[in-house]
C-alpha cells in the first residue's frame, strides 16, 4: 500500500501545499560545484609564523586582513574590518594596544580570529573565548589551531563527501573543544548564507 505524504497548511485558509512545492530548487551537487563554493575552498589563511615579521600601521593591517578574508566575503558581514572596529577592540582589551601606532604579529592574529568569531558570537563572548584559550595555549598555537580547524571544516562542509573533520589539537582540552565549536558554528553559518545566495538571496 502506497502512502502519500501530505503537507499540512499553516491555517484553514491557507492555499494547499503540494509536496513538489517544497522540493529543493537547486540540487546539492550544483551548489557544491558552483563558483561560490570554489571561491570558499580557496581559503588559505597564513599560519602564525607566516604573518608579517615587521610591524604594520593600521591602514596596512586593514588591507592585509581584508585580503586574507576575501574568499569568505560572500558569507561574512561587510565590512569585515574598519579603523573604528580596531580602535574598539583595543579599547575593550581584545587586541593589545599598538606601539607607536604599529601592530605586530600577535595583534594581527587576534584581528583575523576576531573577524571569524564575531560572525557567530558577540564581542564579549569572543573576549571570553580568548581568555579561556589563553589558559592552555600560547598565541602561535592558539591561532594556528583556529586556522587549521577553519580550513579543514570548510573543505569538509563544502564537499560532496562531507567527511568528519579531525581535531588537530596537540592535546584535546575543554578549551580546544570550545574553539572547535565556535569554528563549527561559523562554518555552518557560512554554508547557510552561501547556499541562500546561490539561490538568489541578497541580504
List the predicted regions and their residue ranges.
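Intrinsically disordered, low-complexity regions
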Residues: 4-7, 14, 19, 53, ...
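Basic helix-turn-helix/winged-helix DNA-binding cores
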Residues: 16-133
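Intrinsically disordered, low-complexity, charge-dense segments enriched in Lys/Arg
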Residues: 129-203
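Non-catalytic recognition/regulatory regions in large multidomain proteins
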Residues: 2-35, 47, 74-75, 174, ...
Amino acid at each position: 500500500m502506497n502512502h502519500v505524504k501530505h503537507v499540512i497548511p499553516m491555517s484553514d485558509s491557507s492555499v494547499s501545499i503540494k509536496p513538489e512545492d517544497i522540493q529543493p530548487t537547486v540540487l546539492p551537487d550544483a551548489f557544491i560545484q558552483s563558483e561560490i563554493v570554489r571561491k570558499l575552498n580557496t581559503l588559505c589563511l597564513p599560519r602564525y609564523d607566516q604573518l608579517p615579521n615587521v610591524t604594520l600601521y593600521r591602514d596596512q593591517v586593514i588591507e592585509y586582513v581584508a585580503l586574507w578574508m576575501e574568499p569568505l566575503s560572500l558569507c561574512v558581514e561587510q565590512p569585515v574590518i574598519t579603523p573604528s572596529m580596531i580602535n574598539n577592540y583595543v579599547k575593550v582589551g581584545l587586541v593589545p594596544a599598538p606601539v607607536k601606532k604599529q601592530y605586530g604579529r600577535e595583534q594581527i592574529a587576534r584581528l583575523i580570529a576576531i573577524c571569524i568569531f564575531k560572525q557567530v558570537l558577540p564581542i564579549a563572548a569572543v573576549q571570553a573565548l580568548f581568555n579561556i584559550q589563553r589558559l592552555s595555549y600560547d598565541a602561535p598555537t592558539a591561532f594556528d589551531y583556529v586556522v587549521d580547524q577553519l580550513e579543514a571544516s570548510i573543505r569538509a562542509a563544502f564537499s560532496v563527501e562531507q567527511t568528519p573533520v579531525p581535531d588537530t589539537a596537540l592535546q584535546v582540552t575543554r578549551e580546544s573543544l570550545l574553539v572547535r565549536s565556535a569554528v563549527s558554528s561559523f562554518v555552518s553559518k557560512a554554508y547557510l548564507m552561501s547556499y541562500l545566495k546561490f539561490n538568489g538571496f541578497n541580504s
